[in-house]
Amino acid sequence: MKFAVIVFPGSNCDVDMYHAIADELGEEVEYVWHDAENLDRFDAILLPGGFSYGDYLRSGAIARFSNVMKAVKKAADEGKPVLGVCNGFQILLEAGLLPGAMRRNNSLKFICRPVSLRVENNETMFTSAYKQGEVITIPIAHGEGNYYCDEQTLKRLIENRQIVFRYHGENPNGSLDDIAGIVNEKGNVLGMMPHPERAVDSLLGSADGLKLFQSIVKYWRETHVVTA
């Protein structure tokens, strides 16, 4: 399986994402610059955290116009796994690949610490390695992680089981309905504010994020014929 880590000007979690895939998961991965126009050779697309284009205007608002986003949309339309973490989630929202928007944290402060999440849906290509209702520890690092959507969108997210992760015990940023991560209706595009790539080794405090990447590989192997 081959992963693409998209790199925008201002990305700063691309190395962590690369490490998670190459060193912890043992899969093939490449950095892909934001001006790339074709992602056909990749099986999964990863949009890392950071401050793309300095987060000017709004987080992710400029990155959505990058050349590579047309290819990301194409990959999503084809059903390939697309994961956006933190700033990557914000970019997916701005690009219309996921519903809703991000606001500043209620505290108006940047928050960087581990948080508890509850797995709300373990029947997705990103969460099959988790148990339903499992509580996991994943770090956050953001100033604009306060997810918001209108009532109709929230109702649809709940009915379709598109809310994949919720903050557990404490909501660190004021996010609506404690939402920490959502998928699109097809279930192949996941956006989440917590950083699973920073939780792939117990030496760093948690390895709970590794299961997310393992789930992606498991899904891909179950849906593709692997030849030697």
Swiss-Prot record:
Q: In which pathway does it act?
A: Purine metabolism; IMP biosynthesis via de novo pathway; 5-amino-1-(5-phospho-D-ribosyl)imidazole from N(2)-formyl-N(1)-(5-phospho-D-ribosyl)glycinamide: step 1/2
Q: Where is the Glutamine amidotransferase type-1 domain?
A: 3-226
Its annotated compartments are: Cytoplasm
Highest taxon listed in the record's lineage: Bacteria
Q: What is its EC number?
A: 6.3.5.3, 3.5.1.2
Give a Gene Ontology cellular component term annotated to this protein.
Answer: cytoplasm
Query: SMART domains, alphabetically?
Result: GATase_5
The positions making up the signal sequence are: none
Main localization (coarse): cytoplasm
Q: Name one Pfam family in it.
A: GATase_5
Task: Provide any one GO MF term from the record.
Answer: phosphoribosylformylglycinamidine synthase activity
Q: Which UniProt keywords apply?
A: ATP-binding, Cytoplasm, Glutamine amidotransferase, Hydrolase, Ligase, Nucleotide-binding, Purine biosynthesis
**GO biological process assignments:** 'de novo' IMP biosynthetic process
Which residues are responsible for catalysis? C86, H195, E197
Catalyzed chemical reaction(s)? N(2)-formyl-N(1)-(5-phospho-beta-D-ribosyl)glycinamide + L-glutamine + ATP + H2O = 2-formamido-N(1)-(5-O-phospho-beta-D-ribosyl)acetamidine + L-glutamate + ADP + phosphate + H(+); L-glutamine + H2O = L-glutamate + NH4(+)
Q: Which SUPFAM superfamilies match?
A: Class I glutamine amidotransferase-like
Which PANTHER family does UniProt cross-reference here?
PHOSPHORIBOSYLFORMYLGLYCINAMIDINE SYNTHASE SUBUNIT PURQ
Can you state the subunit structure given in the record? Part of the FGAM synthase complex composed of 1 PurL, 1 PurQ and 2 PurS subunits.
Its function, per the record, reads: Part of the phosphoribosylformylglycinamidine synthase complex involved in the purines biosynthetic pathway. Catalyzes the ATP-dependent conversion of formylglycinamide ribonucleotide (FGAR) and glutamine to yield formylglycinamidine ribonucleotide (FGAM) and glutamate. The FGAM synthase complex is composed of three subunits. PurQ produces an ammonia molecule by converting glutamine to glutamate. PurL transfers the ammonia molecule to FGAR to form FGAM in an ATP-dependent manner.
What is the recorded name of this protein?
Phosphoribosylformylglycinamidine synthase subunit PurQ
Q: Point out the gene that encodes the protein.
A: purQ
